[in-house]
């Protein structure tokens, strides 16, 4: 540790260590950066969203060699200009390739403040107001989901939210699995054949195995067929495999289909199976009086993931995972009990790190909080 600190100190020769208060010229530099960013956010004069430059050509026109001696802030500002000139204009209305895009001023402001305050969300001690803001945001999202009780956390995205949904399903079905492990070969999980690939990732990571991921037929509109789901669960049960969970999708990646949550929930209740809803894209329909019906029945789900950075146009990443039974999420994250140096009994109810798979975690709630204040 001492040797590492000496190396770091040496790299900061001529500057304050640890880096902290602004030095002379730093404020002017940041003002210049902000001016460049604001200029970049003006509509492109040629209307283009991206410049189709092959990697080899871009390498030739961009200095990517990292210097062995610091080149100073003027070089940094020059490189920022270069970066902005080649950036895909994800803030523009014409950017429609993925399921996210756009930019709101309050969202950008939240990102700037989050970066400037640079805290982590594991304990109230180090992120007091940020912890309360995240709790307030999650409470509002639960209200829209019509889940009066429960808990949640901000995650790294919908893929992480789906992973946590399956993890909580495993915890509910096999309470000792987090401590003892489990044999995934006797269990299976059900998804539509148009579900996001992150559900397969969850099956892989959690030890269920891709062979035990059962894909259920969809109708002509790309929605999971509840009767086909019921048949699949019964078929697998006859083969000696137990259902771990069902993942419904609210807004599929390719066709934007919304599964019938009510129909799927009926099947899950019949078989006593955990229902997770992947509402990464479609969750924001809950803010719409016109389109809310697409998610009818979501209050019957056991867990939900919801990406505010998609339909709401917030900067990446702003994604929530919400579970109806808080005790299941706490038990699924029991690994935090090993961190006695970080988490203490007297702060158990206010330390958000106890409900997360992450330790270091940025304050992604602020931009959503500011957005909800604005709209």
Name each model feature, range by range.
Residues 257-289:
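Catalytic PLP-binding core of fold-type I/II PLP enzymes
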């Amino acid at each position: 540790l001492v040797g590492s600190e000496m190396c770091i100190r040496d790299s900061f020769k001529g500057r304050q260590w640890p880096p902290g208060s602004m030095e002379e010229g730093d404020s002017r530099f940041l003002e210049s950066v902000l001016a460049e960013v604001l200029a970049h956010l003006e509509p492109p004069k040629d209307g283009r969203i991206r410049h189709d430059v092959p990697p080899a050509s871009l390498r030739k026109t961009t200095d990517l060699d990292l210097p062995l001696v610091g080149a100073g802030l003027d070089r940094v500002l020059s490189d920022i200009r270069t970066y902005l000139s080649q950036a895909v204009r994800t803030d523009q209305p014409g950017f429609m390739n993925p399921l996210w895009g756009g930019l709101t001023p309050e969202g950008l402001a939240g990102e700037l403040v989050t970066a400037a305050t640079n805290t982590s969300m594991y304990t109230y001690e180090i992120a007091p107001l940020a912890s309360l803001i995240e709790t307030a945001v999650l409470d509002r999202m639960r209200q829209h989901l019509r889940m009066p009780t429960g808990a949640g956390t901000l995650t790294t995205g919908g893929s992480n939210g789906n992973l946590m949904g399956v993890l909580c399903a495993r915890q509910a079905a096999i309470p000792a699995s987090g401590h003892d492990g489990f044999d995934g070969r006797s269990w299976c999980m059900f998804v539509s054949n148009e579900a996001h690939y992150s559900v397969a990732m969850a099956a892989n990571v959690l030890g269920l195995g891709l062979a035990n991921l059962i894909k259920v037929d969809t109708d002509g509109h790309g929605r999971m067929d509840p009767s086909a789901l019921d048949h699949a669960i019964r078929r697998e049960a006859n083969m000696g495999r137990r259902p771990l969970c069902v993942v419904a999708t609210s807004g599929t990646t390719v066709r934007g289909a919304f599964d019938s949550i009510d129909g799927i929930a009926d099947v899950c209740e019949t078989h006593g199976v955990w229902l997770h809803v992947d509402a990464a894209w479609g969750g924001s329909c809950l803010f719409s009086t016109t389109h809310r019906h697409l998610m009818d029945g979501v209050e019957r789900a056991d867990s939900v993931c919801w990406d505010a950075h998609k339909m709401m146009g917030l900067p990446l990443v702003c994604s929530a995972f919400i579970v109806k039974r808080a005790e299941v999420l706490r038990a699924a994250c029991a690994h935090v009990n090993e961190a006695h140096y970080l988490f203490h009994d007297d702060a158990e109810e206010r330390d958000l790190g106890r409900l997360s798979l992450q330790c270091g975690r940025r304050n992604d709630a602020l931009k959503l909080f500011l957005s909800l204040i604005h709209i």
